[in-house]
Structure formats: C-alpha cells, structure tokens
A protein has these predicted regions:
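A fold-level detector for beta-propeller and closely related beta-sheet-rich head/sensor domains
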Residues: 1-320
C-alpha cells in the first residue's frame, strides 16, 4: 500500500484484487496517526489504540480509521433499518471479527470498526454518506488538453464513448455508465463474457449483465477504486481569502483523481482525464476479465482471447 504523511497524520491507500479476475477492484483511502504507546512511536487508530497487528503487519481487526463512523442502523429497502453492508452481496462479506464486548452494540456489518476491510470506513464511507440523497452535488470534472493548455469542465454523459459491450444482448447505455461514475448506478456483476454450455461449447455469458446490489440510501458500495501505486500527496497552500487550505491529492484505478479534506474525509472534487474515458465502460461492466501471467495453464485459447490487461488510470505519485 502507498502512504502520504503530514505531521502526525498518515494517509494510506488500500486495495483488494477482485475475485474471478474481474477488473473492478475495491479501494479506499484511510487515515491513521502516529502516537506514543509505552514510549514507542506507533501507528494508532481513531481511538488512540495501536492500529497494526504485530503478527501480520496488517491493520488489526478492531482498528478504526479516522473519518469512520458506525453504520449499524441505516436506511434499508422496505422502510426498515439495518447495518450498511447487510444484503449487499459483497464477496467476501466484510464481517468484523471483533467480539461483542468490543463492538458494544455495533453490528459486525457496520463500517466501524473497519479493521482490514477495504470497503469499510475511510474516504469511501464519507463519499457514500456525503452524497447520500443524490450525487448531483459531487464535483466531477473532465480534464482535456490542447498543446500545453489544460482545461476543466463538468463531466457529462455526452463525454463518454458509445458503449460497446462484449455481450451482444447488453442493453445498458452511456447514461448508465455516467450514473455509475457518479455512484447512482451499482454497475454490473461482470465476469467472463463467454462460458461453456452443457455441450462444452462456448456461448455468451448473459449472467455478467446482472446488476450489483444498490444500497437503499447513498451511493454504490464500490464508490472508491483501488489505489496501488498512487502515493497520496498532502499539500498546504494559501487560499484566496488569505487563509491556508490543507488537502490530500491522489489517484485511483476507477478513473478518478481526487482532492480530499483531511479533517472530514469529504471529497472536495475529483476529475477524469479524456485519455481514460474509453476504459470507464469496463469498470461499469466489470468485464472483460483481467489477463494475469500464468493463465495459459488453466484456459484454452478461445477463453484467453477474451482477457485484457488490468486498466490503470491515475496510478503514479503526484508532484508539485
């Protein structure tokens, strides 16, 4: 994972490869702090406890990152309430391993504690909740260039290329892909575009067109893409009114480059490059599958021909 620091604040980009070679990988940006524990400098969570499991080197099961809040009782379908991650069909299901005494009434499927789960808490939770009634307030820009000039404009559905699904029976549109970018469409289940029938013959896999499950309130659970090589940049700069602003800048492999308020975890704005527009449909469709080294031993040439390399977007470090 990549990280950026400012004073005692540590911002860590996280990701998890998707199962079944799917290209939509979940990610998040989480904040911890450096603190003194028994005279030693340690990475600590929002409660001031050591955040890292000393045996695994990963974030501990009961650590709670900054910005993360309890979502044990949120709006669900049918006018009921329940834990945010209940019934969303995520694989693996992010069930907390903390005991009942530690949870103190919180659900094991709440965002808090987020522990090592990528989707839980952090910036992802704040973006979901920041726009829980409508994504229309999100500032998503399109960056276009002409020579040495860079221009920013609001991203619109007409900016996206015409869809070209690998499955001929697909009926989704550029408007669906646009809603997915904003978080109001959950995207498709995805997978391999062809599959074997009972006669061992390849046919189109219509199951990849099944929709993911959309939460009853808020934006899609997969609102934040993976952060693999993008190191978060922390920057303090002068504002127009004479004060100073502190922001965190970083890219992720859902096609967006983000600016976050480190106090709240809120997304101030995000932008997409015109050079990345052609790959956004693949994020929505979650297909074709990713081509990894060594797959030749497990698949025949017809299936291998449908695989494509994993897409990378704003995947490097930011400089000033």
């Amino acid at each position: 994972s990549q990280q950026g620091t400012s004073e005692n604040q540590v911002f860590i980009g996280v990701f998890r490869p998707a199962k079944e070679r799917k290209p939509r990988w979940p990610g998040n940006l989480k904040q911890y702090k450096l603190g003194l524990i028994d005279g030693n400098v340690e990475l600590v969570d929002a409660n001031g406890d050591i955040a890292v499991n000393s045996q695994t080197g990963f974030i501990g099961a009961c650590a709670t990152s900054e910005w993360t809040t309890d979502t044990s009782q949120v709006a669900k379908s049918g006018g009921t309430t329940g834990p945010y991650f209940e019934g969303l069909g995520l694989d693996p299901n992010p069930v907390s391993e903390c005991d009942a005494d530690f949870l103190n009434g919180r659900s094991v499927l709440s965002d808090s504690p987020d522990g090592p789960f990528v989707e839980k808490g952090g910036a992802a939770q704040q973006i979901r909740g920041q726009h829980n009634s409508s994504s229309s307030t999100r500032n998503i820009f399109l960056a276009t260039s002409s020579g040495t000039s860079l221009s920013l404009s609001d991203l619109t559905a007409s900016d996206l290329p015409t869809v070209s699904s690998a499955v001929s029976s697909a009926t989704y549109t550029t408007a669906d892909v646009f809603d997915y970018v904003h978080g109001e469409d959950p995207g498709l289940a995805g997978g391999d575009p062809i599959t074997l029938d009972s006669n061992a013959s390849y046919i189109e896999n219509d199951a990849i067109l099944d929709s993911e499950i959309m939460p009853a309130d808020g934006l899609r659970a997969s609102i934040h893409g993976d952060i693999i090589h993008s190191r978060p940049l922390t920057l303090t700069y002068g504002a127009a009114n004479g004060s100073t602003e502190f922001r965190v800048f970083y890219g992720s492999n859902d096609g967006l480059y983000r600016a976050l308020d480190p106090t709240t975890g809120n997304e101030e704005w995000s932008m997409m490059s015109e050079s990345h527009l052609s790959e956004i449909e693949r994020q929505y469709a979650n297909s074709p599958s990713v081509d990894y080294d060594g797959l030749e031993a497990s698949f025949d040439s017809q299936m291998l021909a449908t695989f494509e390399p994993k897409p990378y977007f704003f995947d490097g470090s930011t400089g000033v």
